[in-house]
Amino acid sequence: LLLPAYFSKHDITDRQSIWVKKPTLGREGANVSYYEKRNGLEFAAKGSEHSAFYDQAGYIYQQKFELPNFDGMYPMIGSWVVGDVACGIGLREDFTPVTGNDSHFIPHYFVE
């Protein structure tokens, strides 16, 4: 699933959706917040911690997608791609939709 994303909140045309503001350089849920275009409100995402280091590279706004909840856990799949080659995936889950530093993580790598 590819979600709409913008480098500036001023480029967002969908005023009804909630947007996730994330640092372009970030780590494990740091500095993640939610943004509502219709009223200009921005609020911290549950599970996110703030680090001044990740404020430096700028932010991206991505349309929020509700993750499924399985027995109180929110799973997420991340991928590693080098050039145009898929190299692995990581399965991560946490008690909040924003995965943090202590979330469960299982890496997988691809071998030919």
Protein language model features and the residues they cover:
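ATP-dependent carboxylate activation and anion-phosphoryl transfer catalytic cores
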Residues: E28-A30, N39-F43, F53-Y59, F65-E112
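Active-site nucleotide/adenylate-binding loops and adjacent lid/helix of ATP-dependent enzymes
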Residues: L1-I60
